[in-house]
UniProtKB/Swiss-Prot annotation:
It comes from the Bacteria. GO terms for biological process: translation. It comes from Pectobacterium atrosepticum (strain SCRI 1043 / ATCC BAA-672). NCBIfam families: PRK00596.1, rpsJ_bact. This is Small ribosomal subunit protein uS10. Belongs to the universal ribosomal protein uS10 family.
């Protein structure tokens, strides 16, 4: 696996879950002897929704909600075979979306 790189992108609504998952990935990769760059925090996407409270009139009565999507990026620069096996066996939290690309 010489001259290869594994790029891992993580997305989650809860920043504690994503930080815990990135810490597990970094610790697993370092334990198997790979070189790690990151975790790099990417911009947080904020979606805001405004909803009318009243069913009929009172346009001034509104509630505002927000969903934040936190993102992190981890690069594993020199992965070994043990690194790939350990990452495949890693069990992460259910609220974290993981995208892995080889480059």
């Amino acid at each position: 696996m010489q001259n290869q790189r594994i790029r891992i992108r993580l997305k989650a609504f809860d920043h504690r879950l994503i930080d815990q998952s990135t810490a597990e990935i970094v610790e697993t990769a370092k334990r198997t002897g790979a070189q790690v760059r990151g975790p790099i925090p990417l911009p947080t996407r904020k979606e805001r929704f405004t909803i009318l409270i009243s069913p009929h009139v009172n346009k001034d009565a509104r509630d505002q909600y927000e969903i934040r999507t936190h993102k992190r990026l981890v690069d594993i620069v020199e992965p070994t075979e043990k690194t790939v096996d350990a990452l495949m066996r890693l069990d992460l939290a259910a609220g974290v979306d993981v995208q892995i690309s080889l480059g």
